[in-house]
Design a protein with these regions (language model features):
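Phosphate-handling substructures
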Residues: 28, 71-130
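Short beta-strand scaffold positions
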Residues: 55-56, 129, 150-151
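Generic structural signal for well-ordered alpha-helical scaffold segments
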Residues: 38-45, 128, 132-140
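Short coil-to-beta-strand
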Residues: 2-12, 104-107
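Active-site-proximal alpha-helix that buttresses catalytic centers in soluble enzyme cores
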Residues: 12-78
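Histidine-centered catalytic micro-motifs
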Residues: 7-13, 150-155
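Active-site-adjacent alpha-helix immediately C-terminal to a catalytic or transition-state-stabilizing loop
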Residues: 2, 62, 132-183
Length: 184
């Protein structure tokens, strides 16, 4: 039988509140982000029998995953495969700063995200290749397991589009709040 994946976006961070682009940069969870992760952990421990937890190696995802792991009594395995998209020159910038300094590229990112090339950043297709390879590896290694994947907004949406065999141009059709849980 196939594995079941529980794909989770990390809890709220300080940069989420400020509206800064995170990418590979990091911002710690806020008190609300910790509370979100604790609520999710409680719900998951009551409703699901989880076998493994894998997390992006970026701090905000690790913080979220460790709260889940402590509640579920499962050690968290960290991996670069679940990292957020690298936003290059945009990391740490506010959306208004990006619109001002990179207007043409930002317009492309919003209208044709599958074609956009952020300066010194990754593309959606790079993220798709990375996460598809990771899911394939998990499916070869495990069978009929319940696996939590703690990751990031863009990465979650790319994964979901991939599971749905949908194009990356549809990335904005999927919304992901902090600690959103997607079961596939």
């Amino acid at each position: 039988m196939a594995n079941t994946f529980y794909i989770v976006r990390h809890g709220q961070t300080n940069w989420n509140i400020l509206g800064k682009t995170q990418g590979h940069g990091n911002s710690d969870l806020t008190a609300k982000g910790i509370e979100q992760a604790e609520e999710l952990a409680k719900s998951m421990s009551e409703n699901y029998n989880i076998d493994y937890i894998f997390s992006s190696d970026l701090g905000r995802a690790v913080q979220t995953a460790e709260i889940l792991g402590n509640s579920l009594n499962i050690e968290v395995e960290k991996t670069e495969a679940l990292r957020e998209m690298g936003f290059g020159k945009w990391e740490g910038l506010l959306i208004d700063e990006i619109k001002s300094e990179y207007a043409d590229i930002y317009t492309s990112w919003r209208n044709e995200p599958h074609l956009a090339q952020i300066p010194e950043g990754e593309t959606l297709h790079i993220i798709k290749e990375r996460v598809d390879k990771f899911i394939d590896e998990l499916n070869k290694k495990f069978n009929n397991k319940h696996i939590v994947l703690v990751t990031h907004s863009v990465t979650v949406r790319v994964m979901l589009l991939s599971f749905l065999n949908s194009g990356m141009e549809n990335i904005y059709r999927i919304k992901q709040d902090n600690t959103a849980l997607n079961i596939v």
